[in-house]
Structure formats: C-alpha cells, structure tokens
C-alpha cells in the first residue's frame, strides 16, 4: 500500500500481527463502559497490525518506525523481507524516525549486536529519549512496564552514534513532528505532505482502531498516562476529520479518512 503526499511516496509494511489479550484494554469510565464497548466482540484477544512506513523522497529512503525485527519471534519481522521485495535494502535507508521507544516500533533497528540499518541516522523524540534514559523515571512504572528503559539502553549501546534527538516542529521538507503524548511522554506523530492532501502517521494514538474510533474512551494498559492519551486521541481524531487528512499508524490496517459521526468518529478506508 502506497500513496504520494507532497515530496514523499508513503508505503506501509506489516511486520506482524499482535494478538493483545482483551484484558489489556481499559476504559476511562470503568469496567461497565469497557464491557459496553466490547459488546459483540468475539474471542479473548484483539488483533492489531504492527506497521512501519517507508518514505521515498528527495533525500532517499526514510522509515517511520522499524517494527520488531526478530526480537519477538517468528510471528514478527516480516517487514524486513517485504522491504527487500519492494527494492529497499537495509543499507539504502538513510534515516529512521521513531514515534516512540517501544519494542514493536524500535527493536527492528537492532540485528543481534549491531544496527540493522547501517547507514541510517535514527531520529528519536527528545522527550522519549530523556524519559526512557532516566533512572528516576524508571521508578515510576511497575517492572512489567519498564521495557522501554531496557530498550533505550540497548539503543544507546548498539546505535548510540546514530541517534539524533529531535524536537517537535518541521523536521524536513513536507514533514512535521507533532507532540502526541500520553502513550509515552514523548510520543510523536508525523504529518506528511502539503496543501490539502496530507497523511498523519500517528503512532500509537489508537491501538484497536475499530473500538477506539467509535469510543475513544477505550485505552490500552501500556499507555503511560491514560488520561493524557485519551485527550490526545480525541484531538487527533478531531483534527484529522476537520482537516481531511488521511491517517495511519502503528496498528491501523491501512490508510483511512476520519469522519465525524455524531459525538464520535468513523474510519473510511482509502485505496492505495
């Protein structure tokens, strides 16, 4: 799947499908509201694509996120072969831009004890790199949710000279970094293109799109600040709907337009 936005051809690559236990979902209004949101859902998991994106533009090949690589087993890492099949070799990638420091977005940067993309700068949101490099911040989360700190340490060890902290704002021609905090402190989306036709790659603003677009109060246990993640989700959906931007992200199954539907929203699938 690919579309042109401004100076860039944007292509989506699916690294695998994450089967999240239903128990990992939460709702800002409690258990009854979550049960209502899940009414009609079958099964004990919710399935979500794990995506990364290639931007082909004036400065060569860039990636938004890098998938899991081989770190999470054979169910993941498929984006690597898909990129090669599309003519993108690891050495062709000149820059990888992360939405945030979580394994399904950043572990694909690493191949054993070396960088997988040998010629790439790695752009990391400043606030995420600062948070996940902080021993004090680590103490604020339970052990089961400290993986980002271990990952940041690995990135600094293996890819340290390649890392480039980036602020929000314009980071390249037709690429704007937008703060979208909540899932992580430095969680960042990227607005690609110019004029009327733009694409917002919003990382993990939504995880379970069919549930959360109808009820943005549904959250995910790995949102570090669930209240802020909810507010960010509402703002992102509203802004995309009002501006007519296409959207995709770390776990959406394609490219979509957002439309208002009463007090909520809906997705309209877009062709590649």
For the regions a language model picked out, list residue spans one by one.
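Residue-level marker for buried hydrophobic side chains located in beta-strands
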Residues: 62-64, 97, 122, 199-201, ...
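A short acidic, glycine-rich active-site loop
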Residues: 36-46, 87, 146-150, 220-233
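Histidine-centered catalytic micro-motifs
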Residues: 96-106, 180-187, 248-253
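Cap/insert and terminal regions of metallo-dependent hydrolase folds
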Residues: 196-272
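Active-site metal-binding motif and surrounding structural segment of the metallo-beta-lactamase
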Residues: 74-123
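Metallo-beta-lactamase
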Residues: 77, 84-85, 92, 126-179, ...
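Active-site metal-binding loops of divalent metal-dependent hydrolases
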Residues: 15-17, 66-69, 101, 127-128, ...
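Conserved beta-strand hairpin/beta-sheet module of binuclear metal-dependent hydrolase folds
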Residues: 2-86, 189-203
């Amino acid at each position: 799947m690919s579309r042109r936005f401004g100076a860039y051809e944007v292509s989506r690559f699916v690294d695998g499908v994450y089967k999240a236990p239903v128990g990992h979902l939460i709702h800002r209004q409690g258990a009854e509201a979550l049960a209502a949101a899940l009414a009609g859902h079958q099964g004990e998991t919710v399935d979500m694509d794990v995506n990364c994106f290639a931007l082909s533009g004036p400065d060569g090949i860039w990636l938004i996120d890098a998938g899991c690589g081989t770190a999470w087993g054979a169910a993941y890492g498929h984006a690597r072969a898909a990129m090669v099949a599309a003519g993108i070799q690891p050495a062709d990638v000149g820059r990888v831009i992360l939405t945030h420091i979580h394994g399904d977005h950043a572990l694909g940067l690493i191949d054993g004890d070396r960088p997988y993309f040998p010629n790439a700068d790695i752009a990391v949101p400043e606030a995420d790199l600062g948070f996940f490099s902080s021993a004090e911040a680590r103490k604020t989360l339970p052990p089961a949710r400290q993986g980002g700190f271990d990952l940041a340490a690995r990135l600094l060890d293996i890819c340290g000279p390649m890392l480039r902290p980036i602020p929000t704002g314009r980071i390249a021609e037709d690429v704007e970094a937008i703060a979208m905090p909540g899932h992580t402190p430095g969680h960042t989306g990227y607005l690609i293109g110019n004029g009327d036709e733009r694409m917002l790659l919003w990382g993990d603003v939504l995880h379970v799109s069919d549930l959360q677009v109808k009820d943005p109060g549904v959250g995910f246990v790995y949102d570090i600040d669930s209240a802020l993640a909810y507010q960010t989700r509402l703002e992102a959906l509203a802004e995309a709907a009002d501006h007519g931007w296409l959207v995709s992200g770390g776990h959406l199954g394609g490219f979509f337009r957002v439309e208002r539907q009463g007090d909520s929203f809906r997705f309209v699938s877009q062709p590649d």
